């Protein structure tokens, strides 16, 4: 049976990404000039999903403005929470609008993945819930799963302490569900999918299946994760632009539409649409939209939209909020967020 619906939870404020999320919700932060969530929606569209419901909370108007699905041929609807209800609680609010089988995903991850394959695993195993899993080096910030030889999840623990870790396979936040599991979610109550609902289904003997994720997945929880996602897509899509004038470019690199790079050295850096970089050195830098950098050094740093960095300035290991001005000769460093 065709799976045609997906719910994407995009209600969080993205506090770990401050100051970048002071002015916009996390899912629309740019990854090579597309909203981060666009790649997930593209993955859903490629899997045959026809309708996506975005469960919005923080700055919903901006979500509507940047995510209409028209360029992907997919219908997007918006649902709104008056107060945070948790991931499972948000799905419960939509219960009467959902098909018997649907996809659900956290909207705060960067995911360019094979959702169709996960749907196939779910249907082949007759699971109640299928969870995309991926290995990480430090699983303590995530939910972890123990799986048997068939991929069935036998044990699941949310954000374990170091001494409690029994697996490096973590919940990647992309699920296929049978709607019937939402009957276990109490109405009008904060209820988390991983912490609350999954343990209930496991305790009842319901099949919770693990799926080994295929594609690129990143938790974009912190600013430097956003830089990593931009560099990963620049590399994967082989995005190169030769409009740079008298520039030395090394490593993965991207220039957005209307951007300009001249008389500069760029190492593993991303310059988004409308930004101008001249007479400067960038290394592992993300220069977001409509910035101006002239005669400066930007190292291991992120400039929010509309930033201006003047001659002789240095931005080292820092994250600048939208429209920050760094004056000539000024130095911003040591992990500061401005």
Protein language model features and the residues they cover:
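Glycine-rich hexapeptide-repeat left-handed beta-helix
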Residues: 96, 277-338
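Extended, small-residue-rich solenoid/repeat segments and analogous flexible loops
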Residues: 188-189, 202-292
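Conserved N-terminal catalytic core of the sugar/cofactor nucleotidyltransferase
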Residues: 1-8, 30-117, 321, 329-338
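A phosphate-binding catalytic loop at a beta-strand-loop-alpha-helix junction
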Residues: 4-20
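A short, conserved acidic/glycine-rich loop-to-beta-strand motif
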Residues: 125-135
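Catalytic-core segments of class I nucleotidyltransferases/pyrophosphorylases
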Residues: 102-103, 110, 119-123, 137-139, ...
């Amino acid at each position: 049976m065709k799976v045609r619906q997906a719910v994407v939870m995009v209600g969080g404020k993205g506090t770990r990404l401050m100051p970048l999320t002071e002015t916009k919700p996390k899912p629309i932060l740019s990854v090579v000039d597309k909203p981060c969530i666009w790649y997930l929606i593209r993955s859903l569209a490629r899997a045959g999903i026809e309708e996506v419901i975005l469960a919005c909370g923080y700055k919903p108007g901006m979500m509507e403005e940047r995510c209409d699905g028209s360029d992907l041929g997919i219908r997007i609807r918006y649902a709104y929470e008056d107060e945070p209800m948790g991931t499972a609680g948000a799905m419960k609010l939509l219960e009467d609008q959902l098909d018997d089988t649907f996809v659900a995903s956290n909207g705060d991850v960067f995911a360019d993945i094979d959702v169709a394959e996960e749907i196939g695993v779910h249907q082949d195993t007759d699971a109640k819930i299928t969870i995309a899993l991926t290995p990480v080096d430090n699983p303590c910030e995530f939910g972890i799963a123990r799986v048997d030889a068939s991929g069935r999840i036998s044990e699941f623990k949310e954000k374990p302490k170091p001494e409690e870790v029994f697996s490096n396979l973590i919940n990647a936040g992309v699920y296929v569900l049978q709607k019937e599991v939402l009957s276990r979610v109490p109405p009008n109550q904060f209820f988390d999918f991983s912490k609350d609902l999954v343990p209930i289904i496991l305790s009842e003997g319901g099949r919770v299946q693990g799926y080994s994720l295929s594609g690129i997945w990143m938790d974009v929880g912190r600013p430097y994760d956003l830089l990593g996602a931009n560099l990963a897509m620049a590399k994967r899509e082989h995005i190169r632009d030769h409009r740079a004038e008298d520039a030395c470019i090394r490593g993965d690199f991207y220039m957005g539409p209307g951007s300009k790079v001249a008389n500069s050295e760029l190492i593993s850096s991303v310059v988004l649409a409308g930004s101008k970089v001249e007479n400067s050195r960038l290394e592992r830098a993300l220069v977001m939209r409509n910035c101006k950098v002239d005669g400066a050094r930007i190292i291991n740093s992120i400039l929010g939209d509309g930033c201006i960095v003047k001659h002789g300035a240095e931005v080292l290991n820092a994250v600048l909020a939208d429209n920050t001005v760094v004056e000539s000769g000024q130095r911003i460093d040591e992990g500061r967020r401005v």
